[in-house]
Amino acid sequence: DDFNGTELNTDVWNVWDEMRDWRYSYSKDNIFLDGKGNLINRMSVDDDYNAETGEGRFTGTITTLDKFENTYGYYEIRMIPNLTSGLWSAFWLLGGDMSDEDAADDGSAVNGFEVDIVETYYYREDPAQTIHWDGYYNDQTKSKSFSMAGMPQIFDGNYHTFAFRWSPDEYAFLIDGVVTNRTSEMGICNQPAYLLVSAHYGNAGEFVMKPGEHSDMVVDYVKVYQSPAD
């Protein structure tokens, strides 16, 4: 999706609305196209923000659940992440039976995974790239995060690309077209996955936004190619 025009394509995307996280709420009003070829995911703080409860903080999330799912392929986002402490932007995949209470605890990602293609934390110099597998229940989730030390600065106010290549044999992460990490050690998921584009509060340094302020995650495009070829 190149996010052209002024209306989000709801044939492809779902928009979370009136959903509550313990730190904030999701609102459809915080997801919109700017008419210049960008999707805006706005993080906003109302004038009546309550720091103790998180009431009055809003963000947006879009997903392709039940509208577009894919197995293997190449997944890429081009975006300017949030440039505010206390916030983070994310592009990720969720596939298989991760949310199934009976998900197999077999030490492999064959039956499902969550792939955080990128999570950007402004208070850190390096973004996060992580794979979770074996379900979310009964403390059986397994995770592997990859070192990003020495990567070029992504918090410069410019667009950057973040991608994930998923083949039957390997996972590979890329930033600005450069492979940053490869792995196959946890097994390769062979189940369809859907996409999520989201922005979040918390666990990202000191929260500095004040009532009435906002900070934007600016997305130029999200692209999926069936072939995971180099």
Task: Please describe what each predicted stretch is.
Residues 1-230:
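GH16 jelly-roll
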